[in-house]
């Protein structure tokens, strides 16, 4: 009897807690997503697609010469907006690179025309929070980012073809003399003896090098050319020249600098340079 009484009380408490959670929960998916975003306090903006135009070097505010990669936002348009009502989540699809209508597929032309955008070559999708949604047909420019902001870039690395273990993995190789012949650049032993009697999966060997998607994190924007929609990013970016690069706000940000939400209100002109903030990062020793 005592056990049945305890079970009935626990069932009643569970029912009451469930009812309270249901009454406090948002009634629509949109409200639930907005509530989650407000609770986390984090806004996830849409990214963009850029074209890698090459590398050069500039001088930062402290007079240090730094290598930079030029990324141009070439005709970047929002081609589709996804919501929980239609797709189950919030997302923004963007396209970049003008394509010739007679070379683009009919489905691509129709998809872009639905968003009042010209036929495009490359497409990418980004999950966003409700406060960062963008209308279909909106064009993204370099003003979507700001100087000093950190970004993550993703692209296909330059293909190197079939390479040996010394170039592909940095192996030491075999001795040059002392009885070694022909196999100076070979990998050497690949396993053990009868036990386990096989080569483990993932063993580093010679093979195709490069031509893989890679993401580089936390690259800083040190200059923005608004007239040409070019971002000057500190450091190297994976991919060859004229390759499409996917850009997003840095996931692991070193500082709180971020772009406007959901994007810039109006286009800008001229160029913006990184300004001095705080102490000299290159200062190591101070004279008395």
Residue ranges and their predicted role:
Residues 2-288:
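Extended basic (Lys/Arg/His-rich) segments that typically form rRNA-contacting surfaces
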């Amino acid at each position: 009897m005592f056990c049945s009484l305890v079970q009935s009380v626990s069932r009643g408490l569970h029912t009451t807690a469930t009812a309270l959670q249901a009454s406090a929960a948002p009634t629509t998916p949109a409200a639930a997503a907005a509530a989650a975003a407000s609770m986390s306090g984090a806004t996830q903006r849409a990214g963009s697609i850029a074209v890698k135009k090459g590398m050069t070097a500039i001088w930062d505010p402290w007079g240090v010469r730094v290598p930079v990669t030029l990324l141009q936002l070439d005709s970047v348009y929002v081609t589709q907006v996804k919501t929980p009502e239609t797709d189950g989540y919030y997302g923004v699809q963007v396209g970049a690179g003008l394509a010739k209508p007679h070379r683009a597929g009919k489905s691509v032309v129709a998809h872009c025309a639905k968003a009042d955008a010209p036929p495009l070559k490359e497409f990418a999708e980004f999950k966003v929070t409700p406060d960062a949604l963008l209308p279909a047909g909106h064009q993204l420019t370099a003003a979507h980012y700001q100087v000093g902001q950190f970004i993550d870039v993703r692209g296909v690395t330059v293909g190197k073809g079939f390479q040996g273990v010394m170039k592909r993995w940095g192996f030491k190789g075999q001795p040059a003399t002392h009885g070694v012949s022909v196999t100076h650049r070979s990998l050497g032993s690949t396993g053990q003896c009868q036990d386990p009697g096989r080569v483990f999966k993932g063993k580093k060997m010679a093979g195709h090098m490069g031509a893989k998607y890679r993401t580089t994190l936390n690259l800083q924007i040190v200059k923005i050319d608004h007239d040409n929609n070019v971002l000057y990013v500190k450091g190297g970016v994976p991919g060859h020249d004229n390759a499409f690069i996917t850009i997003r706000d840095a996931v692991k940000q070193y500082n709180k600098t971020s772009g406007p939400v959901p994007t810039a209100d109006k286009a800008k002109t001229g160029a913006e340079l990184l300004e001095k903030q705080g102490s000299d990062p290159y200062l190591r020793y101070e004279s008395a």
